[in-house]
């Protein structure tokens, strides 16, 4: 049986490929052989939960945003579901980063999306009553159980 891609499995488009088709420009600094100048209204170092969300808000406000990340950009279809490959591609120090005293390993992301890319498997669905409370109390939009179902 042929491997299905993300769109076939989930019925939604890959967010990275969708972003690129909507005008994202991606550059790999490792490909540069000489210095280059990039212009932006805002430069954000790190593309994890904080940097990524901040970039989206600023871009929607009309600012030109430059995201700078140490690791690679991976599309959903780049994931092979192989831990050994993920360690070298997605983690700081091939998942070998340790606390200063060596007592604890630190599983820190090194890719576009940061540690959120590797921690998504420990995310749980927000209870429906919590989503409803947020909607009633804080007038949130787009976060009903049905609207969140694809994610």
Question: What is each residue range found by the language model?
Answer:
Residues 9-146, 150:
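N-terminal glycine-rich phosphate/pyrophosphate-binding loop and immediately adjacent elements
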């Amino acid at each position: 049986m042929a491997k299905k891609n993300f769109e076939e499995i989930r019925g939604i488009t890959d967010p990275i490929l969708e972003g690129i088709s909507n005008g994202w420009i991606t550059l790999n600094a490792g490909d540069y052989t000489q210095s280059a100048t990039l212009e932006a209204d805002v430069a954000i170092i790190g593309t994890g939960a904080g940097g990524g969300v901040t970039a989206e808000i600023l871009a929607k406000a009309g600012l030109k945003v430059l995201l700078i990340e140490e690791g690679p950009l991976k599309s959903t279809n780049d994931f092979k579901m192989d831990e050994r490959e993920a360690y070298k591609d997605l983690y700081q120090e091939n998942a070998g980063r340790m606390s200063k005293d060596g007592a604890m390993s630190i599983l820190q992301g090194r890719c576009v999306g940061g540690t959120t890319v590797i921690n998504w498997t420990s995310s749980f669905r927000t209870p429906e009553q919590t989503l409803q409370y947020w909607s009633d109390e804080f007038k949130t939009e787009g976060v009903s159980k049905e609207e969140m179902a694809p994610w």
